[in-house]
Amino acid sequence: MIYARANPELINPVTVPTEISEVVLVLANTIRRSPAFTGILKPVTIPLNTVPTDINAEDATSNSTIAPAKGSNTPGFAASSLYTCVLKNIGSNTAEIATETWNAVANDVITVSRGALHAIFGNNPCTGPVKSKLTPTNVTLGDDTPKSYDAPVSAIPPPATATTANATGVKPLE
């Protein structure tokens, strides 16, 4: 049962926001993480390889996601740039999607962000499953697969020795 009091503001003062700015909505999205992946069609997620997703939104309805990738050299970059990352911009109109390839940072190794205790598996909630745009080249099936090994089979089976148990049920030593 609720009792009315003369001065409710003195009992439980509560500040109610009347307006939420767009900056707050953008900053709320900056903690998303995307799993690191290799340059293959189905990415292999490794438990401790997560990086924070960078989101720079012009308004609250658009977001940008940067996911790390390992691929071949891309046009416009130095010949030694092997590590690249993909930037995917999704604007207010979801039909307008632009994808660019950026030169990654100088660090080759992706490490766990500070404060990340558990890895995140599966899909990134804002981009969905990440797939590589690179097609595999110079790959022939069977180069790195182990050869089958068949154990040698003797043409003569081993001699069968029959031993009978004594009255106690124990077989004698041979």
From Swiss-Prot:
Residues 137-174 are annotated as: Disordered. This is Uncharacterized protein R70.
